[in-house]
Amino acid sequence: NVHRKNPDTLLRTGEKMDGMGVEHMRIIRTTEAPRWLQNADGATLGIGEYYDTMFDFLRAYIQKPRKMSIDIWQVAQVYPQSKSYRARPVECAKGEYRDSFPVCRGNRGMVSVDADGNVVPCHQLSGYYANHGLYIGNVKKEGLQSLLQTGKYIDEVCATLGQLKASNEKCASCKYFRYCAGGCRAISLAFTHDKFGVDPSKCEFFKNGYYEKLVGTMGDWRNLAPISFD
């Protein structure tokens, strides 16, 4: 997890792990989770600050031959051995978007259960759901099989991008929506308290030129999901 108190350790950590033969490293921004905000003392990186910090890290990391791949949450997946990368905010490459896609394909493929047995759309939402009294099922009380067949939980994780567009005029009219696919629902809830709200991190990425900055940072490396905003 990266925050304002540890960015200077990233490159050294990455180089050490690469030298040890580690195949993959994942970096994630410590987000606005309720408990973290209570104890973080202002350490959370702002969205633009996070992007800039990660680009600085990537720029330094790829200066030398590497083997270890890097997954920077909501920023990029980087594969040094093939000199290729993908911008993670590009959920759908050109021509891939469909209204029928779930709002989060990760949620649709993985059941998240908290320590009390409550199911949530994803693990990052467990604190939010608990703090706001949101309940969509419990595996100890109702059993997993029934939760996966009908009810609030399955309705949540099967919600589609078409439903999001119908509930969110800003996203529906945005030229970047067909690429970001609405972004991350956990980030949206943290900032807007609306499961169909905007994900401001994706607005920042596309509207403030961070896609182009990533392409510039990676230079001649192959972009696995190139897009254009015609």
PLM feature spans:
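Sequence contexts marking disulfide-bonded cysteines in secreted/extracellular proteins
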Residues: A93, V103-R105, A181, R185, ...
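Short Fe-S-cluster ligation motifs
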Residues: V198-D230
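C-terminal accessory subdomain/extension
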Residues: V139, A190-D199, C203
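Membrane-interface junctions of multi-pass transporters
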Residues: S126-K175
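Secreted/processed peptides and extracellular or luminal domains of membrane proteins
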Residues: M110, Y128, F177-C180, A186, ...
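Local cysteine-cluster metal-coordination motifs and their immediate loop/turn environment
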Residues: P121-Q124, N168-A186
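Short cysteine/histidine-rich zinc-coordinating motifs and their immediately flanking basic loops
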Residues: G183-L189, K195-F196, L214-M218
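Radical SAM enzyme [4Fe-4S]-AdoMet core and its adjacent flexible, acidic
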Residues: N1-V119, Q124-E142
